[in-house]
Structures are given as structure tokens and as C-alpha cells.
Amino acid sequence: MTMRASLAIENFLEMMSAERGAAQNTLESYRRDLEAAAEELAAKGVNLAEAETGHIRMTLDTMAAQGFAPTSQARRLSALRQFFRFLYSEGFRQDDPTGILDAPKKQKPLPKIMSVENVGRLLDRAALEANEAAEPGERIKALRLHALLETLYATGLRVSELVGLPVTVARTDHRFLLVRGKGSKDRMVPLSRKARDALQKFLTLRDSLPGSDDNPWLFPAFSESGHLARQVFARELKGLAARAGLAASSVSPHVLRHAFASHLLQNGADLRTVQQLLGHADISTTQIYTHVLEERLHKLVSEHHPLAD
């Protein structure tokens, strides 16, 4: 039995209100999405209540072409799913045309990126505190934090990879770290001179502590067994950021990992190399940084093209 789109929408909204107790805002949102889809399809001679999968996909494609966010497209599809399930359950349709449609993928937010200047301020503050700490307990923690930061910014390690480094990696070739990442995949990452120096200063003091010979971790937790917890590192990092005059809320181990990748790309590294250094199994994961490449290419053309504005 065929039903006009407008009547079908009213019946659906009445059911949502009476049987499911949907809030007024929810009902209005459903109405807007369903009426917009009905109007678009009517202009093409299609009754929304009789629409097929291709028609529904077309309305979503139109939204995308008009610049609607994936969240708006997903909301529209959700309303249509509820609508067609209602028609199916009431016997007005023999199928649900939305059943095989996937929700539009949400765009990954661009990572927060610290400027080179702010990373420098953070590292300088860590170095200052490592040099000035006099009390033994404070000195070892300050040296550890400085070594952690220099290593993180030099390598872009995941925080779990960083705090879980075995001490043996610092006793072999000091120019590289052998890192075991996700899926137990190993990769070699180079160390900067500053990172090697900070690690060596920390390691010298670490090795002088009682029981250090039996501790397998490069960055041990001094108050308990095991390695430094990533939550403790994140907390110490935020405290350091505040002392360096930076907004603590904008600084985290993950933000520094993003800074490592972005600063490499800004200075000429290619995406494939950055993928290998970050330990991404798929290049698509690294492509969140393509905006950095686009900015670099735009700048390159602007500076070197003879007819650029």
C-alpha cells in the first residue's frame, strides 16, 4: 500500500512521540531531515516512502557535495533508518532500503601541533631543571624527564613505547633505538645528539642507584616496581609546560609525537619516511598530516614560481 511521504512522516513522528517518548528537539530534528529528503526526492519524481537504496544514497551524496559535515550526513541517515524501519514494521514496505548503507565516515580531527618555538621552550626548561636540581631525588626525576622529552621529540615514539623501553636499548648503538611497536613489530629510529646526551646523563645517575642492575627498564618507576607509568609522565609533562609558561592543557606526550611528525614534514621529509618512523602499518594513518605537506607545497610555489602572486 502506497502512502504519501508527508503522511508517512507524520505517522512516524506520532509513533516516536507516543510510543518512545522522543523529546521535542529530537522530533524536530527528525522532521527536518525527513522533510528535506522528501523534498529533494519529490523534485526527482520519487516518493520518499517508496524510495530505494540508490535514492537514499543519492540524498547523502548531495549533502556531501553541498559541504554538510559527515556528522550531519550520519544524522540524516539515522533518521531515515528509523523512518523506514517504522514503515517496514507497520507493513507499508517489504524491505528497508537503508539496511546496506554505511554511515558516512567522520573526518579525523587534525592533530594539535606545537610550534618549534614552543617545543624549544619546553626542552630548554627541562634542561634547566635537570642542571639546577640539587636534591638527589629531584635531580634523578629532572634528568629522567629531560631524557624522556628529548627522546620523544627526537623519535616520535608512542608514549607506551617510550616508557616501556628496556635499558638494553641505551647500551648498544647510541645513534639508534630499536623499538618494539604495535603488533610486536620492530623498527629502528635515529637519536639526535641532544637526545643521546640527555639519555647518557640520566643513565649515568640511574646506574648509580641501589638495585639498578636488576631493573630491566630504561625509565623505572622509582617509587614502585616496573617502568614509569605513562599517566605519571603525562602529569610531569604538564607541570613542566606550566613552568615553561605554556598552556598545560595543550601539551601531552601525544602532542609531542605529532610535533615530531609535523616538523619533519615542514622541513622536507616525505610522508612514507614519517610513516616508517612513527610505526604506522598503513600510510592512510599518516595522511592526517597531509595538510602540512599542502602548506609546504603552497609556500614553495608562492616563493619560487615566476608568475606566482
Curated annotation (Swiss-Prot):
Gene Ontology CC terms: cytoplasm
Subcellular localization, as worded in the UniProt entry: Cytoplasm
Domain Tyr recombinase: 109-302
Domain Core-binding (CB): start-end pairs: 3-88
Keywords tagged on the record: Cell cycle, Cell division, Chromosome partition, Cytoplasm, DNA integration, DNA recombination, DNA-binding
GO biological process entries: cell division; chromosome segregation; DNA transposition
Record-linked PROSITE patterns: CB, TYR_RECOMBINASE
InterPro entries: CB, DNA_brk_join_enz, Integrase-like_cat_sf, Integrase_catalytic, Integrase_recombinase_N, Integrase_SAM-like_N, Recomb_XerD, Tyrosine_recombinase_XerC/XerD
Catalytic residues in the record: 158, 182, 254, 257, 280, 289 (o-(3'-phospho-dna)-tyrosine intermediate)
Molecular functions (GO terms): DNA binding; tyrosine-based site-specific recombinase activity
SUPFAM superfamilies from the UniProt entry: DNA breaking-rejoining enzymes
Highest taxon listed in the record's lineage: Bacteria
Pfam families named in the record: Phage_int_SAM_1 (PF02899), Phage_integrase (PF00589)
Record flagged with keyword Cell division: yes
Subunit structure as annotated in this protein's UniProt entry: Forms a cyclic heterotetrameric complex composed of two molecules of XerC and two molecules of XerD.
Family: Belongs to the 'phage' integrase family. XerD subfamily.
The protein's role, per its UniProt record: Site-specific tyrosine recombinase, which acts by catalyzing the cutting and rejoining of the recombining DNA molecules. The XerC-XerD complex is essential to convert dimers of the bacterial chromosome into monomers to permit their segregation at cell division. It also contributes to the segregational stability of plasmids.
HAMAP family named among the record's database cross-references: Recomb_XerC_XerD, Recomb_XerD
Annotated protein name in UniProt: Tyrosine recombinase XerD
Native organism: Brucella suis biovar 1 (strain 1330)
Gene that encodes the chain: xerD
